[in-house]
Every structure is written in C-alpha cells, then in structure tokens.
C-alpha cells in the first residue's frame, strides 16, 4: 500500500496500448468498487472483476475466439487471486505467449503471505520491488501493512477486509450497541509495526508527554533507538 502499484499498473497499460497492443485489465476488491482499477492519485479505469470462479485461461481463449486481440494482461490486486488462478496466468504466458503483468502486495496485516502472492513469487519470471517507497509516520521506509479498528492496531481478524484510509467493516468483528467498527490500513516500518505504534498512537503519546512533569524516552514512539537490550543479529531497515 502507498507504493504506487495501481498507478504503475495503469501506466503500464497506457504504454502498451499506445504501441498498438491489445490487452485486458483485471482487478479484485479495488477500493473504488468492483470492476475498477484506481490509484490514490485519482486515476482510475474500468477492469474485469476477478471472482472465485474466474479462469484466466478460459477468459483469454474466449476473447481470442471472438476476435479480440489479447497481447497482454494487467492484473491488479493480485494478492487476492487464488494459487490456481496464478497458475492459469503462468499457463497463458507459456502456452500462448501473452504477457502478464501482476501487481500486488505480498503480506497481510499479520505479516503472513497472501496465498496468491506466494504462488506468484514461486512462478514469476521476474519479481520487482517498486521504486516508490511507502513511508512510515516516522519517516522510515514502510515495510508492513497494519490494520486498525477504530484507530487501534489489530493483528487478528479476517485476512481480506477491503479498505484504505476510508472506513470498512470487518466481517469478523462484532457489532455492539449499533456501533460499526471503522477499519483502516496504515503502512509502518518494522520497528513500529512490532511495537504496534501507529501515527494516531504516536500523536496520543506525544500529547501525553507534554502533560507529564518529566521527560519520557521518546524512542518508544519516535524511533530513535532501542531500550538497551543488545543483540548480535542485524536486520536492514
């Protein structure tokens, strides 16, 4: 999230169409609604909505039989595809020489690989990390997608809940007293993901710090260092 993958998908589609190639755009669970590819920059276009029963091989063969030119596929939100659908995409590439460009995130809000993303990594000819880096609220490169419910980071719930910075309802959540939990997503660096410190939480702690008669170690939320526990292991930030 926040790394420009849908923007790149739209740009890729534009570049190929500008050279006279014929393609089909696919997406699933886009934040703009069904049958759309949208980016946070405000760009969006129509697409074929991928469902549980979508068979990419049959879809391409049907279109070609009807006389449509299909040279490439743009597959956005590919993390939501099933492993079987990813295998169908590989077959489309290998058997009928159709180029497939898949865009998606690798892991969910629990840091677990999406099944579709895992199969893509296993089968793809090439995996590229997007050059546009998402940023954590602290300014570091964001590497994890956190889910928040009513502003509080959670690590349990349904794997797929469509949302963004807008509200969505978690189907695994219970509704009490007519309250519908507001679900959002935020990109965090590993440090603040592990500490469960979101931008909202950091702001609250900063406000509390201003009310205290003593100074609180800012590293707990500003990411300026650890708390003295040494380790010999290294991890890239």
Q: Model-derived features: where do they sit?
A:
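Walker B catalytic acidic pair
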Residues: 77
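Sensor-1/coupling segment of RecA-like P-loop NTPase cores
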Residues: 93-116
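Conserved P-loop
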Residues: 1-64, 108-119, 132, 168-175, ...
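Short recognition patches in nucleic-acid-associated and regulatory proteins
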Residues: 133-177
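A short acidic, amphipathic alpha-helical/loop segment
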Residues: 12, 84-92, 116
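Residues immediately C-terminal
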Residues: 80-81
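Short basic (Lys/Arg) and small-residue
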Residues: 124
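Walker B beta-strand of ABC/ABC-like P-loop ATPase nucleotide-binding domains
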Residues: 73-74
